[in-house]
Amino acid sequence: MRIAVIGGGSSYTPELVKGLLDISEDVRIDEVIFYDIDEEKQKIVVDFVKRLVKDRFKVLISDTFEGAVVDAKYVIFQFRPGGLKGRENDEGIPLKYGLIGQETTGVGGFSAALRAFPIVEEYVDTVRKTSNATIVNFTNPSGHITEFVRNYLEYEKFIGLCNVPINFIREIAEMFSARLEDVFLKYYGLNHLSFIEKVFVKGEDVTEKVFENLKLKLSNIPDEDFPTWFYDSVRLIVNPYLRYYLMEKKMFKKISTHELRAREVMKIEKELFEKYRTAVEIPEELTKRGGSMYSTAAAHLIRDLETDEGKIHIVNTRNNGSIENLPDDYVLEIPCYVRSGRVHTLSQGKGDHFALSFIHAVKMYERLTIEAYLKRSKKLALKALLSHPLGPDVEDAKDLLEEILEANREYVKLG
C-alpha cells in the first residue's frame, strides 16, 4: 500500500518513518510518498529517511498534493500552516492583550485554526475526489480540525490523533509494570481538554492507586502541578493543558516571562536539520522537539486499521454514544475499538459534570469559529473569541481580531 505524508519537511518525519518501519513486518507498506511546500527542508529530511529505510519500502517525493494522495490508502496530515512564524504570532499576539499565548489553546488556537481551515478544506476535497483515503490528522489544532472535517466537510474517513493519550497510557503502564495494551482508561473530552475518570490495568480498577501515586509525586514537587486538594475534590486526572484554564495567572506569568516556545523550536529545528544532513540514526536532539510517542500513535493506528486484531486507541472522532450525556455528533477524544478499517466508539457511561462544563463551552467556541470561517464573518469570529474561557475582554476583542486577521491575511479574509 501507499502512505502519503503531507508536511514531509517536518522535523518529526524521521520519527514517523521509524514507526512505519516498526509496523512494516506486520502490514505491507510498498511506498511512502512525501509532499511539502518547503522543498528544501523536505529534501534534507527525505534524504535522511532514505538512509533510515534502506530498501524496506520505496521512499518518494511528489511535487503536488494530488500526486501524493492519488493512489494512497492512508494520508497523514502533519503540516503546519504558516510554519513556525505563524506559531510565533499565535503565541505572541495574545500576550499583548494579557491573554495566554499557546499554539492550540485559546486565542492562539483560534488563529491557528483560521489558517488551517482553507488548506484542510482544499486537501480533503482533493482526497475525496481521488483516492478516498483514510486521513490521519496531526495538524494542530487537531480536535478542532477533526470537528471541521467530520461535521462540516462531512468526510467520514478522517481520524484526529494526539500523543497525549498514549503518553498517559505509557506512564500508567510503567507505574504498574504492565504493557500498553493492559491499560484501559475511561477517557473523554476534547483534544488538549481531556479527562481521565477511571484507570484499569489488566481489568482491575486501580484508579485510587493512581491518585495516591499522583499525590505523592506532587507533594515532592509542589510548584509543578495542581495542589493535592485539587485531585481530592475533582477526582479526575486532567490533561496537562488544563493548566491554562485552571492556573491561568501562573501560566500567563510563566509564558510572558520566558522566550516563546516557537522561538525555542526554531533553534532546535536549526540544529536538527544540520544533523539530518548526514545522520544515519535519529538524533537525540529530536527529544527536545516534543511530540513523544507521536510515531507510535500514528503507526500503530494504521497497523490496527489494517488487521483484524481489534485494538483500542484513543482518537478524535464523533461521540456516537460513548459519553451518554454528551451529544452524539460532538467530536471527542475517546477510546475506540479499531479493526479492519473501522473505528468503533466504546460505551463509557456518563461524563462528570465538572468535565462537561469545559467540554460544552469549548465545543461551542469551536463551532462558532468554524461557522465564522465558512461564512467569512467577523461578527461570528468575535462571538467565537468572546465565548472561549481564555478569550479577550469586550474592550479588546475587536482590536485583537483585527491583529490576528492581519497576521493571517495570506490565509483567510473575513468580512
UniProtKB/Swiss-Prot annotation:
Binds 1 NAD(+) per subunit. GO terms for cellular component: cytosol. GO terms for molecular function: 6-phospho-beta-glucosidase activity; hydrolase activity, hydrolyzing O-glycosyl compounds; metal ion binding; oxidoreductase activity, acting on the CH-OH group of donors, NAD or NADP as acceptor. It comes from the Bacteria. The record marks E103 as: Increases basicity of active site Tyr. Mn(2+) binds at C162, H192. GO terms for biological process: carbohydrate metabolic process. Substrate binds at R87, N140, N163, R261. NAD(+) binds at residues 1-64. The active site is at Y241 (proton acceptor). Pfam families: Glyco_hydro_4, Glyco_hydro_4C. Gene3D superfamilies: Lactate dehydrogenase/glycoside hydrolase, family 4, C-terminal (3.90.110.10), NAD(P)-binding Rossmann-like Domain (3.40.50.720). Its EC number is 3.2.1.86. InterPro entries: GlycHydrolase_4_CS (IPR019802), Glyco_hydro_4 (IPR001088), Glyco_hydro_4_C (IPR022616), Lactate_DH/Glyco_Ohase_4_C (IPR015955), NAD(P)-bd_dom_sf (IPR036291). The keyword Metal-binding applies. Its cofactor is NAD(+); Mn(2+). Hydrolyzes cellobiose 6'-phosphate into glucose 6-phosphate (Glc6P) and glucose. Homodimer or homotetramer. Exists in a homodimer/homotetramer equilibrium state in solution. Is a retaining glucosidase as it hydrolyzes glycosidic bond with retention of anomeric configuration. Reaction mechanism includes redox steps involving NAD and stabilization of intermediates by Mn(2+). This is 6-phospho-beta-glucosidase BglT.
